[in-house]
């Protein structure tokens, strides 16, 4: 999950989330930044719902809606909470809260990618893209997201471009 939003007390959020995550025996990684949160966590539905409530009720992320999936085994070895100064590890002076594209729901996404004039660009790292990607998407083949601008700068943006 991720949520792009200003979080004034992101350091306190990381402490609160670490405390709650340990109490609920969660695993995975959570990043807290002034521009938002990012993470993938595993645990009981009850424990994960407590995290969602913490983010929505105590930190003003009212629009936060995580994506849920199920696993027969715990996919992570440990629980980590990390503080970062930036949500996106990219150079430059930009504000990801104000300067971002439009989010599309899954129904709209499927309609948009069906258009032959749409380019789908997979900006995830090599490990993630080896697991799978959308048919006919352009895979950036980067080791880290921070390497994406070198790849992305070579694309002519005169068509609709979808990033994931």
Q: Where are the regions that the model predicts?
A:
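Cytosolic catalytic domains that perform sulfur/thiol-centered chemistry
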Residues: 1-164
